[in-house]
Every structure is written in C-alpha cells, then in structure tokens.
A protein has these predicted regions:
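Histidine-centered, transition-metal-coordinating active-site segments
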Residues: 1-97, 106-490
Length: 490
C-alpha cells in the first residue's frame, strides 16, 4: 500500500447510503476504508454480470461492505444490551471491523473467477490451507488480513486480526480462543448474519426485484443462545419471510438464464488464460491490463498464475483488457456488447418423460455432480459437426440451490435450548447426502432449479441434439423427442 500512511482522523465520518441512510464510520475504521486493498472493492460488482439483465444492479462490494459494517454495529449493540456482563468496547470494534472487511478477498468478477481458482491446482495451492471448506475469497481475505500493512492498522485500532478472521469465517472455537463470546461469530457468519441481511436487501433494491425486510423487527428479536444467535418467537414470521424471499431471489435474479450464461462466458475467458477446459493450452499471449497501483504506473501482463493477479483488476478493466488470444478477445467483446450464449437445452421436471419425481431428483442430482464431464462430452459430440467450436462456447450450468440451513433458531425464551422449526426445517444443503425431505426444497428442485446447456446462437439445434444424446447415453434416461429450444433472442 505504497504512499498510504493509515493515520486515523480524530472524528467519525457519516456516509449516506441508499439502503440504510446514514452510516457512521468510526475514526479507527476510516484507515481501513481508505486502504487501497479496500478501495479497490469499488470496482468489483456485488452481483457480477447481473447488470446485463437487470441494468440498475451495478452496486459494488464496497457499498455492501459498508452496509455490513452498519448492520453488524446494530446487531452487536443489541446483543450488548442482552449480554451479562456487557460486551467490552474492543469486542464491538472487532465485530464491526469483521463486517467491514468480510469481502476484502474478492477478486475480479468475484464468484465467476473463483470457480477457475478452485479448479486450478496451481492457484488452489496458494490459498490458506488452514480454512478447509471455505470459499476462495475467504481464504484470500484471511491472508490479506494477516498481511503486514493491515496488521499495522489492526494494532493501531487495538483489535486482534486473528479474532477478526475467526469472526468472518464463523469459527466459534477460534472466536472463543481469542477471548470473545462465541455467539459473536453469528453476527458475520450465521443463519441471520449482517452479510445476508445487507446483500439480500441491497440486491433487491438495485435490481428492482421487490422484497421487503423489516430490519427493526429482526434486530429487536435477537437473543443470545449457545453457541450462536437466536431469535425470539416475535421474529419467527420475519425470518420465514426473509428465507422465502431469498429463495425467490435466487430463481428470479441469480439463476436467471442470461445471468448464468454471462457468468459462464466470464469464467470461460479466465479459464482460457489460466488453462482451458479439456486440457487445451493456455492463451499464449496472456491478458494485458492496466494496473492502477503498478510501481511504474505502466501496463502489466497478467496471466492469472498467481492469486494476487485476481485482485489487480476491476470488473470493467477485465472486460476492456486487450488480449492477443483470439478467443479471449472475442468473448470479452461479446460480453461488452451483450451478445451472449443462449439456451440450447433446459433440463427440468417437464422435459423428462416416464419417471416419477423421486427418480427425476436422483437423475438431476447425478447430472449436477457430473456437470463438467457432461459438458466435455457434449462439446466433443458438438465438435463433430462444428469443428471450429471452442471449449468456452459450451456449458452445462446447474441452477444454484440456495443454502437455507441452520434456520431452527427460534426460542420461546432467550437461551431456551428447545428450538422451534421454521417451514424450512430440514432443508438439506448437501443434495448428494440424502433424499430431499423438506417440501419447499423439493418443489424448488422440481420446478425452479433447471439445468441449462448453453451454446452459440448459430448452433442451438445441433447442441440440443448433442445434449439429449449424451444424457441418454450417460444416464440411460428417456427424454421426450421435443424439448425446449428457445428461439434466438438478446
């Protein structure tokens, strides 16, 4: 963070936010906000390519992080009123900073590039090995928070950096080991945490997909449980409404077919640079991009062989970065002009004949688990008819199933060990683990979670034939002769 001294001002700052109104940033928090590692989040969109379908959804992770700071402060203030003894000031500071910094590890186009990071051994080996099961941005964030420049700011704020990492990752044991009550981990990472409360309402506001959330009712219902946060019965209805609206948002927003195809194309561009699918050679000329904080202020060649490269580009910089590789250059230009891949085939309950619901769910889950292999086989079949096709032109993309777990947090009285289930009780985040029993989740998977096959607009019919033949061969499943092939459209 060259040229940045990190000196805290004497007074707090008041920021205006479209969602929360006034947000107070305390003096010791301002150096973190001003740090280049945090300021770069202005260039990382909160919802990635969603703006190509919902034009106003151009809010950034910078704004979201400030919103989580605000809500974490409100939540910890409520919990402090309930705690005996009350929470000391340093614990409150740690929770607020965890809210502010929880997304600091996000790179260019966030989750789109993370998929490549996980699938590339060279990159995966650079992530924090002490956080198995966590997402790449959390592992990168942990490394950044423990780096020398940010450690100096933590020391200046009298906050333990490792405690903040434990809060962000929801590590109850780690939070306790650093002297904080373990329930505080639920403020940042839990069923009703500040992160979810902000991104749900913020994504709704800026996308135009309506959803009403009563923050005051939820916060007034907070209670301290063991080991995490509970809600009183007064908050039960609000929690169920939140969870229901979240599921609706997944179907309408995050899993929209245009959003998913744009996400695939971004992933394909990064994949082509790092090391494309199916063993093809990486783009030989790399990706040339201007990096604002380069020592000489000149262009640098980024080949995404290091995790740090993902932090050096904004979303817009990636889309406009020149590349010597024809495929990379073409796909970025198509993203800029919204000339996207389209649906060649949609697998959902009404496109599979002569099987019952349980058999369909098993079949769909088998396709989800082997989506990469199915993609490769469809591509190989399609190449027989279209030899010029690139691996990045064909995708098998299952809808993302929202995680609605650990929702049985309703207690009759604060601290009551008896939990009362919501209508989402039994929602199973691991679909391969056991048969789905929650009726809401079951219907979601049957009717609201299609599996898409995307292909170039000029090759939809042949791609549909390739997809159906591969699925019949691999899964021995009878598909109807006529399946949904959309007419080409923007």
């Amino acid at each position: 963070m060259r040229g940045y001294d990190g000196a805290p001002p004497r007074r707090a700052k008041y920021l205006r936010d479209a969602l929360h109104g006034s947000i107070v940033v305390e003096p010791h928090e301002i150096p973190f906000v001003d740090a280049p590692l945090f300021q770069r989040l202005r260039g990382i969109l909160q919802t990635g390519p969603v703006y190509l379908t919902y034009p106003s959804a151009r809010h950034s992770r910078f704004e979201h992080a400030l919103g989580v700071l605000h809500l974490a402060g409100r939540m910890v203030a409520r919990l402090a009123d309930l705690a005996h003894p009350s929470l000391p000031a340093e614990h409150r500071r740690a929770v607020r900073l965890a809210g502010l910094l929880h997304d600091i590890g996000h790179g260019v186009f966030s989750h789109s590039s993370e998929k490549v990071m996980v699938a590339t051994p060279l990159l995966a080996a650079q992530l924090d090995p002490a956080l198995p099961g966590h997402q790449p941005h959390e592992k990168v964030g942990a490394l950044l928070l423990r780096s020398a420049p940010l450690r100096r700011l933590f020391e200046q704020a009298d906050v333990d950096a490792d405690a903040v990492v434990a809060l962000i990752t929801g590590d109850h044991a780690g939070v306790r080991a650093h002297g904080l009550p373990p329930y505080l981990a639920g403020v940042i990472s839990g069923p009703i945490d500040a992160d979810k409360l902000d991104y749900f309402a913020r994504d709704s506001l800026f996308s135009g997909v309506p959803a009403i959330l009563d923050y005051d009712r939820l916060l007034q219902s907070l209670a301290i449980g063991e080991p995490g946060i509970q809600l009183s019965m007064a908050g039960a209805g609000e929690l169920e409404k939140l969870l229901f609206n979240r599921i609706t948002m997944y179907h309408a927003l995050y899993n929209h077919h245009k959003v998913q195809t744009a996400d695939c194309m971004i992933q394909g561009a990064v994949e082509a640079i790092v090391g494309p699918a199916f063993g093809a050679a990486p783009a030989s000329d790399g990706l040339l991009a201007v990096v604002a904080d380069s020592p000489e202020g000149s262009a640098q060649t980024l080949d995404f062989r290091r995790v740090i490269d993902f932090l050096r580009l904004s979303d817009e910089a990636l889309l406009h970065a020149p590349s010597g590789d024809p495929y990379v250059s073409d796909v970025l230009q198509r993203l800029r002009t919204r000339r996207l891949l389209q649906r060649a085939f949609v697998l959902q309950r009404d496109t599979v004949a002569a099987i019952d619901d349980d058999t369909y769910l098993d079949f769909a889950e088998a396709v989800r688990r082997s989506a990469d292999l199915v993609r490769q086989r469809i591509f190989e079949r399609l190449r027989e008819s279209v030899p010029t096709l690139h691996p990045g032109d064909v995708w098998v993309r299952p809808s993302v199933v929202p995680r609605v777990s650990d929702t049985d947090v309703i207690a009759t009285t604060p601290g009551d060990a008896t939990r009362h289930p919501t209508i989402f009780s039994g929602w199973n985040p691991d679909l391969a683990d056991r048969r789905v029993t929650n009726p809401v989740q079951r219907n979601y998977l049957l009717y609201k979670a299609p599996i898409y096959v995307f292909a170039p607009p000029d090759h939809l019919a042949v791609a549909e034939r390739a997809a159906t033949s591969v699925l019949r061969e691999q899964f021995d499943c009878l598909l109807p002769r006529v399946t949904f092939v959309p007419r080409p459209r923007g």
